[in-house]
Amino acid sequence: MQSRLISIAASEGFTFHHAERNESTLTLWLKDGPSKLPGYATHQVGVAGAVLDEDNGKVLVVQDRNKTVNAWKFPGGLSDQGEDIGATAVREVLEETGIHSEFKSLLSIRQQHNHPGAFGKSDLYIICRLKPLSYTINFCHQECLKCEWMDLQELAYCSNTTIITSRVAKLLLYGYNEGFHLVDLTMRTFPAVYSGLFYSLYHKELPETYEGSATLL
């Protein structure tokens, strides 16, 4: 919309719905009662990758340069529009650490409202399990202070980390010792009810006896 038209639309009762880059969308509910138009984005999505080397039990960790507390954490960042969760984890790990990896599963989801870094919106922070495809660290010094392969047991009970990192490290340790089928949410792609579109569904693996032809939902 041309900016000179905004004041005219506002005088007729239109209000801002959302703005993105060079475009603004204003709306006006014409029926009686309050507007039932759905709001715009309510969440931002951050994704981290827990890259575990199953041959030696070491996990890839970083310390962010711009944090007030230099705690060990999994490398990650914000998901781009239209980017799958696993793809975000793989991309962010490569950008921050130089390590190539492969998505294996989703481990956890944290929801936090009124997130300071999300312009007052809610934040979803998702941690994925990744398999390393390379091992030589070449980390980004602009984003990270440190980067190393740390023993998973050490990270799980380390005092110099966050609650969520420690808890997911323990979950990862449980899967490493007892079997990842106990902790993994795997991803499957299905056709959506909308023509030509597909969606990703994350869930625990189903036994073969329960598998059947998919019904569109």
UniProtKB/Swiss-Prot annotation:
- Entry-linked PROSITE patterns: NUDIX (PS51462), NUDIX_BOX (PS00893)
Q: What is its EC number?
A: 3.6.1.-
GO MF terms held by the record: ADP-ribose diphosphatase activity; NAD binding; NADH pyrophosphatase activity
Q: Indicate the segments forming the Nudix hydrolase domain, all copies.
A: 42-177
Q: Where is this motif: Nudix box?
A: 77-98
Q: A cellular component term (GO) from this record? A: nucleus
Query: Where is the protein localized?
Result: Cytoplasm; Nucleus; Mitochondrion
Q: Which InterPro entries match?
A: NUDIX_hydrolase-like_dom_sf, Nudix_hydrolase6-like, NUDIX_hydrolase_CS, NUDIX_hydrolase_dom, Pre-Nudix
Report where it is expressed, by tissue.
Detected in liver (at protein level).
Q: Sorted alphabetically, which keywords does the UniProt record give?
A: Cytoplasm, Hydrolase, Mitochondrion, Nucleus
The disulfide bridges present are none
What family classification does the UniProt entry report for this protein?
Belongs to the Nudix hydrolase family.
Function in brief: May contribute to the regulation of cell proliferation.
**Extra remark beyond the main annotation:** This protein is coded from a FGF2 (BFGF) gene antisense transcript.
**Protein's UniProt name:** Nucleoside diphosphate-linked moiety X motif 6
